[in-house]
From Swiss-Prot:
Component of the chromosomal passenger complex (CPC), a complex that acts as a key regulator of chromosome segregation and cytokinesis. Has a role in error-correction of aberrent kinetochore-microtubule attachments to ensure that sister kinetochores become bioriented and connect to opposite poles by promoting spindle assembly checkpoint signaling. This is Aurora kinase. The gene is IPL1. One of its GO terms (biological process) is chromosome segregation. The lineage of its organism: Eukaryota, Fungi, Dikarya, Ascomycota, Saccharomycotina. Pfam families: Pkinase. ATP binds at residues 154-162, 177. It comes from the Eukaryota.
Length: 412
C-alpha cells in the first residue's frame, strides 16, 4: 500500500502545484515551520534548478555575472545545491564505506533493500486533474507533514533544507527536501521545478536516485527522495584527495551506465559532477539532481542553447555559445574521470576567465602519474568536437575499465 501511495500522489500534486503557487503568493513567510523530533536517520539531499516560467529554455545573461566572484564550485544558475554534510554522519558500527583502501567510515544502514516505483508521469504538461483525482486513493490526496517523523537536518541550501524522515505508517526511511513556495516564486523556478519532477519521477534504474513523490501545504513544497547512506561522492573525494584506478574506474563505469539509460530515454543530464553523485552501499553510486535535465533525443536534429551546469564541467560548445546535445554528458564524464584520478578538474584556474579560455582551447595537462590507459580514455572523452567524443558503449568497454574490473567490490 505504501508503494501505491507514493506512486500516485506525486502525479496529482505535480499538475496542481503551479496553480496552488500562484493562488497563495501572499500567504508565505520564510519560516520552514518544521518541528524536529529526536529520530536519528540519515538520508541524503537533493536540489532544484532555475529557469524562466514564460519560456522553457532561456539563456543566462552572462556567464561572468552568474558565477560568484570566488572560484567555488557553484552552479551557474540562481540556485544552490543542498550539500550532504558527511562529517555529521552518526558513526555506528558494522558496514563500512569503501571508496578506496585509505578511507573507512563505519556506518549502519537502516535503508530497505527494495524501493518503491515512482510515479508514471504523462508527457503532456496539461491534463485533466479531475479525472486523475477519481483514480487516486484517498490517502494520496491528503499526504501531509504529519505522516512523517522528522529527524536531523542533512543539508541546507538557498531553496531550503533536507531532513531525515521516517514514514510513520510504513516505517520507510527517506530524505525530505523542504522548499518554501515563496522562494520558488521569487526565483521564478516553478516551471523548471515541475520539469525536474516530471523527469526524475519517471526514472527507474539502479544507478539513478529515486524520486518517490511530493506534496505541499500552504507554505512549502516537500520532495520525498531516496536514501543514500554515504552522501555525496564529492565529500569522499575531498577526504581522499584522489581515487585509485580501481575505485575511479568503478565509479565511471556506473555513471556511464546511468547516462546510457538516460540517453536511451532521450534525457540529457547536463550537470554531471561529484556533488551530484551519491554513494550507497557496496560502492554503488546513484546519479542525482535533475535540475538542469531536459528531454532531447540523441538522434534528433534539435539542439539546445541554454548555458547551464558548473563552470569547471562546461564543454567548449557551451563556452562558445554554440548549440549542444547529449554529448555534453560525454564531455562531463571525461572531466569527472580526470577529477577522480587527479583530485581537481582539468581546466580549473583561480581566474574564471582563464578557465573559460582553457576549456575553449581544450588546454589539457595530463599528470605523469596517470596510467596510459586512463590517459587514453580521458583524451577520447575530452574532444572539442562533440562528434569525435567516444560513445558510452566504448567507455564501458575501454581497456582501463575492463582491466580494473577484477578489483571492484561485488555488488549485492
Amino acid at each position: 500500500m505504501y508503494c501505491r501511495v507514493f506512486t500516485h500522489f506525486s502525479l496529482y500534486r505535480l499538475y496542481t502545484l503551479s496553480d496552488n503557487i500562484n493562488i497563495n503568493k501572499t500567504n508565505h513567510n520564510k519560516s520552514i515551520g518544521l518541528h524536529q523530533h529526536r529520530v536519528n536517520y540519515m538520508p541524503r539531499s537533493m536540489t532544484a534548478s532555475s529557469s524562466q516560467l514564460k519560456r522553457i529554455e532561456t539563456r543566462i545573461e552572462s556567464l561572468s555575472e552568474s558565477l560568484s566572484k570566488s572560484n567555488a564550485r557553484k552552479p551557474l544558475g540562481k540556485f544552490q545545491l543542498n550539500t550532504f554534510d558527511n562529517n555529521k554522519i552518526t558513526k555506528l558500527q558494522n558496514e563500512k564505506v569503501r571508496p578506496s583502501k585509505s578511507s573507512h567510515i563505519p556506518v549502519k544502514s537502516p535503508i530497505r533493500k527494495k524501493g518503491h516505483s515512482p510515479a508514471q508521469v504523462l508527457q503532456n504538461e496539461r491534463m485533466d486533474t479531475k479525472l486523475l483525482l477519481q483514480k487516486l486513493p484517498s490517502a494520496s490526496r491528503h499526504m501531509t507533514l504529519d505522516d512523517f517523523e522528522i529527524g536531523k537536518v542533512l543539508g541546507k541550501g538557498k531553496l531550503g533544507k533536507v531532513y531525515c524522515v521516517k514514514h510513520k505508517t510504513s516505517g520507510y526511511i527517506a530524505a525530505l527536501k523542504v522548499m518554501a513556495k515563496k522562494d520558488l516564486i521569487d526565483l521564478k523556478l516553478e516551471k523548471n521545478f515541475r520539469r525536474e519532477i516530471e523527469i526524475q519521477s519517471n526514472l527507474i534504474h539502479p544507478k539513478i536516485s529515486r524520486l518517490y513523490g511530493f506534496f505541499y501545504d500552504h507554505k512549502n513544497v516537500y520532495l520525498i527522495l531516496e536514501y543514500s547512506i554515504h552522501g555525496e561522492l564529492y565529500h569522499h573525494l575531498k577526504v581522499q584527495r584522489r581515487f585509485n584506478d580501481a575505485t575511479a574506474s568503478h565509479y565511471i563505469y556506473q555513471v556511464a551506465l546511468a547516462l546510457d539509460y538516460l540517453h536511451t530515454k532521450h534525457i540529457i543530464h547536463r550537470d554531471i559532477k561529484p556533488e551530484n553523485i551519491l554513494l550507497s552501499t557496496d560502492n554503488c553510486i546513484k546519479l542525482s539532481d535533475f535540475g538542469w535535465s531536459v528531454k532531447s533525443s540523441p538522434s534528433s536534429s534539435t539542439k539546445r542553447l541554454t548555458i547551464c551546469g558548473t563552470l569547471d564541467y562546461l564543454p567548449p560548445e557551451m563556452i562558445e555559445s554554440n548549440e549542444h546535445d547529449y554529448t555534453v554528458d560525454i564531455w562531463s564524464l571525461g572531466i569527472l574521470c580526470y577529477e577522480f584520478l587527479v583530485g581537481k578538474p582539468p581546466f580549473e584556474e583561480i581566474d574564471k576567465n582563464s578557465t573559460y579560455k582553457r576549456i575553449a582551447k581544450v588546454d589539457l595537462k595530463i599528470p605523469s602519474f596517470l596510467s596510459s590507459e586512463a590517459t587514453d580514455l580521458i583524451l577520447r572523452l575530452l574532444q572539442k568536437s562533440p562528434k569525435k567524443r567516444i560513445t558510452l558503449a566504448e567507455v564501458m568497454n575501454h581497456p582501463w575499465i575492463m582491466n580494473n574490473q577484477q578489483y571492484w567490490p561485488n555488488e549485492n
